[in-house]
């Protein structure tokens, strides 16, 4: 892994040419009073360093062969007794392959020296007043040396636009990690299906998911799990997870683990009592057909929008057939009448963040999919109670979501272990 991290830093150094990149990790965050949230490193910082401790900054030079420097906390026996192991600069330098490493306490003295006679600084710009102030302070310190013939950089460039494009294409190590995260999450969804029955609470199902994530090496859930029974599934980001599960209703679970800094993201919808009703099956099969059409369009050379357009066409025609929308397919698409039942996009990038980085459009047009990209494919339909809607469809929310790795010839569904056909779901729940 050290070699992969070094390769990423060297690639960034080539892209910034005669500049210097300065990238901080995330700060620790207080939950309340003396209780902290579990610490997670900043995704950009971790992508380049693999380093998980707070109070750290990486500096990468576009000159001198891509020199990389880590600033981190010193070893401290007393703090390690209370808070746990620290690498310290020397061990971190060796473990993660940096050219140099220093105490974070010395950065105000060392960093201005590194900014002399370079063209520009690459850093996350506008992420917060405190970080911007630190950058300006280092810059001003360098400017004070102009009488010595040392020039300060005169441009600030947001490094995230460069790193976004690097992170968009996953290397083989990232792909393998994401496959493993997907496998853990798939098994968690299977266990959740097996334990679901009327009378249980949503939070009981959530607990099973979180238990399986942690038991299998996941450090955190990738996001707050959605466990939404019945009408709760019509709330796209429902996270209360505190309602009882009712016989005859569906349960929508949107949950995935994070493993070694990489997210998985799966949604399945299934009957609480193990058997779809006729109306539930009609809508479910429609959403599944839309997802399969979108997956078929998830291939290199196709536009980012191609899977979404394919899903929308299938859903719109299905809504017409079920008398939920009225008019021709072209009319429903033009007026976006389908939008009242399907109001979100069909996917997003996936990686170190669950809604991962990378532009969806380039120069005003949808970008083309390419091997190594990972995205979700997640059409759905959400039908609230309304006198205009047949009663058998009221309060049904369905979403089916898989994670797709674009390959040379199409895509690999890395979450395929999770059952999603009506027959497979009913068979699993009956076992």
Please identify what each model-predicted range represents.
Residues 1-431:
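Active-site neighborhoods and metal-handling regions in enzymes and metal-associated proteins
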